[in-house]
């Protein structure tokens, strides 16, 4: 079926990667000396291949940490930030009748577990700073709460997500699953939604983000987590049922 709105798959061509840089006022502070080299390594690998958008409070500090790189491929935007999870607080790219749009949903720290007053404004600030191409149309999607890691698209009208996350307390608990489904189908131009009904992970602050459980690898392939350790608490938990749902309930995936 043709769609006016298309939510691209993970493998769709992109113009840049966005990173939100760790600093001493984030939760990474106690292990910042370990985290910064990791982000530097990620940044350098991205810069070798495409443009990199870095959101940070202090551009000078990040330049010192990066050292010698091709800065022609780096776009800096200075602003206050709470944390580093750009996949969750960042804008979600769609095409509406071919026009690129950037959806800006509410990000509230995974159901108000953590401070997100700055991160919730990042996409809006980036648009005000004219960071994106002039053809990109920003769209305010408030008051709906949605993190990028909570949805997965095959780019062909199918979206995968979890029941546990989208309707959780302090997100969109005022909506029934049927209402959530209608809304998501409308704004993302979907034919169907694959709801994972399991997905417990010990220590997970996201309430079962689908990107920690199952991912589309192609239009007909889903990769999912699986626990093989019989001593692990996940071996007989709901998490083990994720694979069964992926294998038995949905087509045309393998």
What does each model-found stretch correspond to?
Residues 1-247:
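The feature marks the mature, well-folded catalytic cores of soluble enzymes
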Residues 253-254:
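Intrinsic-disorder-associated, low-complexity terminal segments enriched in Asp/Asn/His/Tyr and depleted
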């Amino acid at each position: 079926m043709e769609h006016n709105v298309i939510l691209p798959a993970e493998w769709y061509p992109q113009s840049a990667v966005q990173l939100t840089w760790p600093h001493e006022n984030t939760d990474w502070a106690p292990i910042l000396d370990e985290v910064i080299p990791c982000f530097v390594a990620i940044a350098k690998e991205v810069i070798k291949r495409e443009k990199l958008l870095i959101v940070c409070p202090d551009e000078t500090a990040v330049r010192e940490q990066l050292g010698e790189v091709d800065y022609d491929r780096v776009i800096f935007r200075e602003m206050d930030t709470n944390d580093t999870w750009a996949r969750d607080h960042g804008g979600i790219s769609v095409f509406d009748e071919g026009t690129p749009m950037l959806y800006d949903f509410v990000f509230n720290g995974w159901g108000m577990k953590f401070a997100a007053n700055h991160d919730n404004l990042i996409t809006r600030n980036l648009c005000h700073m004219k960071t994106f191409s002039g053809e990109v149309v920003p769209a305010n999607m408030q008051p709906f709460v949605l993190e990028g890691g909570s949805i997965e698209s095959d780019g062909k009208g199918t979206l995968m997500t979890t029941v546990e996350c989208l309707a959780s307390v302090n997100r969109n608990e005022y909506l029934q699953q049927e209402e959530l489904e209608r809304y998501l189908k409308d704004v993302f131009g979907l034919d169907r939604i694959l709801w994972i009904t399991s997905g417990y992970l010990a220590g997970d602050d996201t309430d079962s983000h689908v990107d920690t459980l199952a991912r589309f690898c192609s239009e007909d392939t889903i990769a999912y987590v699986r626990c093989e350790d019989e001593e692990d608490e996940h071996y007989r938990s709901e998490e083990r049922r994720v694979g069964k749902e992926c294998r038995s309930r949905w087509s045309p995936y393998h």
